[in-house]
Amino acid sequence: MHICIINSIIWFIVKYKKKHGYSLFVEFTHAYGIGEGTSVNMRGVNIGYIKNLQINSNSVLVSIYIKSEKILIPKNSIIETNQTSLFNNTIIDIIPLEKINNYSIRDFNVFNQNCYDLQIFCNNQYIIGDRGLNYDDLIRATTRIAQRFDDPRFFNLFYLFLQNTIEISDDFILTFNNISSMSYYLYIFCRDFLLNNI
């Protein structure tokens, strides 16, 4: 009976410790395909998810849940949305731009009032997010390039460039052949001159 109670207490403590994370609020100008449950990654590792999403007239406010209070995110970080595949799988990437000194922040946690003076994000802190890699932009840019190549003026200019290049190369080959012929005749002349005068 006592073992069962002790196991229950240990299970509850472990379960409570595992689920004790913190929240951040990130504002984006556009949702870029993110939604509730979207993964949040830092250095390629999943550290949380989107808990809630609120659309305003000029922006989208996202509530991010970080799974553990031990995961410290530097304030000098880029927080951006990225598409990970052609199937429109979107994630939020946190890219730290500097290393933080673990010794200076090891005694603090994200729930402490002094946390705001440190170089890490704190619980319920407000952050502005950016737009990262997006396949829609890539497709638009490719379409624009294809439209430029489809322009007849471009092909006329390209054809003129190729024609001039071919003419220049033909002239270069002719000039090179003339120079090599002249050098051959000069060699024969010098050889005969030297052989006759020696």
Curated annotation (Swiss-Prot):
<dbReference type="GO" id="GO:0009507">
    <property type="term" value="C:chloroplast"/>
</dbReference>
<keyword id="KW-0934">Plastid</keyword>
<protein>
    <recommendedName>
        <fullName>Uncharacterized protein ycf22</fullName>
    </recommendedName>
</protein>
<dbReference type="Pfam" id="PF02470">
    <property type="entry name" value="MlaD"/>
</dbReference>
<dbReference type="InterPro" id="IPR039342">
    <property type="entry name" value="TGD2-like"/>
</dbReference>
<keyword id="KW-0150">Chloroplast</keyword>
<dbReference type="InterPro" id="IPR003399">
    <property type="entry name" value="Mce/MlaD"/>
</dbReference>
